[in-house]
Curated annotation (Swiss-Prot):
A motif (Nuclear localization signal) lies at residues 81-95. PANTHER family: POLYCOMB COMPLEX PROTEIN BMI-1 (PTHR10825:SF21), RING FINGER DOMAIN-CONTAINING, POLYCOMB GROUP COMPONENT (PTHR10825). This is Polycomb complex protein BMI-1. Component of a PRC1-like complex. Identified in a PRC1-like HPRC-H complex with CBX2, CBX4, CBX8, PHC1, PHC2, PHC3, RING1 and RNF2. Interacts with RNF2/RING2. Interacts with RING1. Part of a complex that contains RNF2, UB2D3 and BMI1, where RNF2 and BMI1 form a tight heterodimer, and UB2D3 interacts only with RNF2. The complex composed of RNF2, UB2D3 and BMI1 binds nucleosomes, and has activity only with nucleosomal histone H2A. Interacts with CBX7 and CBX8. Interacts with SPOP. Part of a complex consisting of BMI1, CUL3 and SPOP. Interacts with E4F1. Interacts with PHC2. GO terms for molecular function: chromatin binding; promoter-specific chromatin binding; RING-like zinc finger domain binding; ubiquitin-protein transferase activator activity; zinc ion binding. It comes from Mus musculus.
Length: 324
């Protein structure tokens, strides 16, 4: 399966940094003529003495260059989300500035201009932040009842709550569930958001950004347990071998009944179809005992064992029947 390429923040720096001050964008502002971006204070100060873009020398405006620059909120949000701690440090600098200069006119500015916006309001998540999440079993039957608007049955609340670092990956969460619930390696655990399985390399911060978590409650996650693909392939091979064994035993009995078949047929060493098949997952009540459309319970027609069936053999050309 193709894995998404993850790159370092230093590889994106040319797209996130202002060429005038050498730092990350603060109040990113873009020239509409050439779409080059700078910090607001940097480009305003530069255009006081020049009417051309500092990067490509395109004329911004003949007389009033400030008319052709626009605030770029989308770019600024990207910078805040990609650079750890930048938003928090900038808000602190603004609060400190207005505390040291109470006469500065900040009444006309927004809360963000005054540094009075918290990370939660801006939906900025840092790697070291602790995220509250809920995890519960993904019940397909419950989902079907909800879709069909059936009356829900009395259900046990199996939802659990965790507090984890934002940098924790889905793979770590799967390992935690396997260890906590003693799930054997023959079963696969999928962590899901609503009905969509999540990739192992997703962090909780990635999930919060991708699915626009609003912090109005714990991050809702689900999990399901299912047999691994390898186990399912082995079951298919076992079924094929059993069918081949039945064909072989039938052909052997035909040879015993024929006049030319002087050698008694030998019983197959493959397991008998009448042998009861144990449920592969008795410890997981959530998992159905039916796999690939076939039930694991033995058929009623195969209750009698091969040992109790009469055996036919040929002795001196005469057919004899002996019971086991």
């Amino acid at each position: 399966m193709h894995r998404t390429t993850r790159i370092k923040i230093t590889e994106l720096n040319p797209h996130l940094m202002c060429v005038l001050c050498g730092g990350y964008f603060i109040d990113a502002t873009t020239i509409i003529e050439c779409l080059h971006s700078f910090c607001k204070t940097c480009i305003v100060r530069y255009l006081e003495t020049s009417k051309y873009c500092p990067i490509c020398d395109v004329q911004v405006h003949k007389t009033r260059p400030l008319l052709n620059i626009r605030s770029d909120k989308t770019l600024q949000d990207i910078v805040y989300k990609l650079v750890p701690g930048l938003f928090k440090n900038e808000m602190k600098r603004r609060r400190d500035f207005y505390a040291a200069h109470p006469s500065a006119d900040a009444a006309n500015g927004s809360n963000e201009d005054r540094g009075e916006v918290a990370d939660e309001e801006k939906r900025i998540i840092t790697d070291d932040e602790i995220i509250s999440l809920s995890i519960e079993f993904f019940d397909q039957s419950r989902l079907d009842r909800k879709v069909n608007k059936e009356k829900p049955k009395e259900e046990v609340n199996d939802k659990r709550y965790l507090r984890c670092p934002a940098a924790m990956t889905v793979m770590h969460l799967r390992k935690f569930l396997r260890s906590k619930m003693d799930i054997p390696n023959t079963f696969q655990i999928d962590v899901m958001y609503e009905e969509e399985p999540l990739k192992d390399y997703y962090t909780l911060m990635d999930i919060a950004y991708i699915y626009t978590w609003r912090r109005n409650g714990p991050l809702p996650l689900k999990y399901r347990v299912r047999p691994t693909c390898k186990r399912m392939k082995m079951s298919h091979q076992r079924d094929g071998l059993t069918n081949a064994g039945e064909l072989e035993s039938d052909s052997g009995s035909d040879k015993a009944n024929s006049p030319a078949g002087g050698v008694p047929s030998t019983s197959s060493c493959l397991p008998s179809p009448s042998t009861p098949v144990q449920s592969p997952h008795p410890q997981f009540p959530h998992i159905s005992s039916t796999m690939n459309g076939t039930s694991n319970s033995p058929s009623a027609n195969h209750q009698s064992s091969f040992a109790s069936r009469p055996r036919k053999s040929s002795l001196n050309g005469s057919s004899a029947t002996s019971s086991g």
